[in-house]
Amino acid sequence: GYLMHRCAQVYVNKLQLPLECRYLYCSRYSLRLPLYHRDMETALNYICRGGIEVTVEKILKRSGIREAEKERTLKLLGWEEQRDRPLPYSYLKKIRQKLKGCPFFLKAMEVNSRKKLPSLLGYLEQEGLLDETPMALADSGWTGSMQKEINQALKILGKSGQLSGYYWGLYELPEGIKRENYHCYYFSPEKGLRKKVHFSNSLFESIFSAPHGMTTGYEKKNGRWEPVCGPGNEKKKRFLEELESILLEYAEKQAERIKDIEKLPLEKNRREISRQLRRIMGKPSFQEAEAFGNLPFSDDVFDTEGQMTAEKLTEEELKANHAWNKIRRMSGFSKGYVKESPWYEGSAVLYGKSPGRDLLMYRIYKYLLYLRKKYSPSRKNIKEKVQDVLPERESL
């Protein structure tokens, strides 16, 4: 994350640590699209994953195909009239099957992916990821997929060995990786059930995202590879720039107080962080929900940010997200689309008639979800849904 990188620079400089912090412009989209053609099954899983208000239009945007190719795909599959209609979670598997059976779409996705690979490889090499210097990735986390994709790209470039990653938290791990290369601070796939339940990665991303838009690719300018970023949101940019100045001032003061970095009360700090996050994320005051819930939010490709972090939900929509109602729909026993909020807890406090009841029922849902994930790791539908939202924007 951008703000964590800026704060880390303060600590490195103030404490004269033998480290160099570099910022890598990337996103799940900018890393995955160039690699689609190397594993089309995984690519289809990615573009047909869940999220907030997933539509056919959104799925085709994830594929990276051109506008004309998108229009032809819609026509071939008879989806022109439903392109912007929100899809129930249980429909995503059917959408994937239809796309897999469309040769035109698969070819278009493969060709566009191959074209993007040289620019990704060029950028990673330019930024020094092939250097022999010991290095590691640091990120907010959630699925650990970007580390795997960066390592795949570096392997194409001839790098031996694997980069390790250090994360705020991980809900799950990619398949085919070495567990010892993934390090978690706050929660991990195996531990931290209560922390996960009272945590909102969507709110975390809203507050700590970068002021620039999402990285969508790379282009060469004046002999250098430069990131191509989406336009972002001006309101969000102003908030993040103000937050950056506050955090940097805080980091400066904290760094001055540290006499011996080896004697920091890490466990005490972790407990205090957990206490504060549980309260703010899991049971916010009205003022907190209003301040952070009204930040623009996007969980997908290209920062349209047409919704708020705490989306406005009716009483009926809040109840539809209660444990039993949500599980029935996710399992396919009940039909219909359920409107979700990136930060449900904020929405419940702002718009619910009985926010205490709403928060309790949503916590039950999250407990059941993460418990089922832990004890049924082979259930793909659960793996795909373990999220408030897994936002598309990420930088390292």
Task: Enumerate the predicted regions with their spans.
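Long, low-complexity, Lys/Arg-enriched
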Residues: 1-396
